[in-house]
Amino acid sequence: MATQKETTRKRDKSVNFRLGLRNMLAQIHPDISVQTEALSELSNIAVFLGKKISHGAVTLLPEGTKTIKSSAVLLAAGDLYGKDLGRHAVGEMTKAVTRYGSAKESKEGSRSSKAKLQISVARSERLLREHGGCSRVSEGAAVALAAAIEYFMGEVLELAGNAARDSKKVRISVKHITLAIQNDAALFAVVGKGVFSGAGVSLISVPIPRKKARKTTEKEASSPKKKAAPKKKKAASKQKKSLSDKELAKLTKKELAKYEKEQGMSPGY
């Protein structure tokens, strides 16, 4: 028997958060799904945030410190997200680190489940190690980064799902993600236009045109409507002027006969 050749697939070694984002969408919008291309773009945004926060956390470390801790990640995320988003994000990150610390001794479940997060803590730690410039990363720092990514992506998923629902769609597309970020000033300030490699769809609001008077077509212009024929005027019956007896006496016989004929009188003989 001839042996069948086994085809092997090269494993993608790049970090992605597709699984966690699917789980987040199921919680935020249970009745809406996401297209494969849109899910890849969402994962790219999450990786972009992880890299930016990792670089920021390293710059905030004191001199001589070789370990990235949760405090540095908190400061970097708050600085990247701005005033409003940063305040809420830091609160969620602190809660996640606290939950993980209380459930750390338990051997059951992953680090993400202990912190009650959908974004993978292990993949967030990998981003910190690869792009943070430090080989030492504390467990709290990885949890804080995962919580920071999850908070921001939760905002994006909520707005993108609303945009899909407004468009009467049941699947989120790249266009809905673009629309969600462009219409929110805080999200757009963080992400901007540089992430949408597969989309690049710029939606411009166009006012609804007003209804204009109907224009005549060339066919209608070439054959104008026929004018209605004027109504025929009824011929007014001429009233014959009747003569007095004195005037009749002056008439000759021929004139009198003519007059009587016009008046419809029988001739007098």
From Swiss-Prot:
Region Histone fold, residue ranges: 1-168
Entry's induction text: Expression of viral histones begins 2-4 hpi and continues along the infectious cycle.
Top-level taxon: Viruses
Localization in the cell: Host nucleus; Host cytoplasm; Virion
Gene Ontology MF term list: DNA binding; protein heterodimerization activity; structural constituent of chromatin
UniProt GO cellular component terms: host cell cytoplasm; host cell nucleus; virion component
Keyword line: DNA condensation, Host cytoplasm, Host nucleus, Virion
Entry keyword annotation includes Chaperone: no
One matching Pfam family: Histone
Region annotation Disordered: where it falls in the sequence: 210-249
Residue stretches of biased makeup (Basic residues): 224-241
A Gene Ontology biological process term: chromosome condensation
Domain notes: The N-terminus is similar to eukaryotic H2B, whereas the central region is similar to eukaryotic H2A.
Role, per record: Histone-like protein that is recruited to viral factories during viral replication and participates in viral DNA packaging and virion production probably by forming unstable nucleosome-like particles. May compact the viral DNA.
UniProt-recorded name of the protein: Histone doublet H2B-H2A
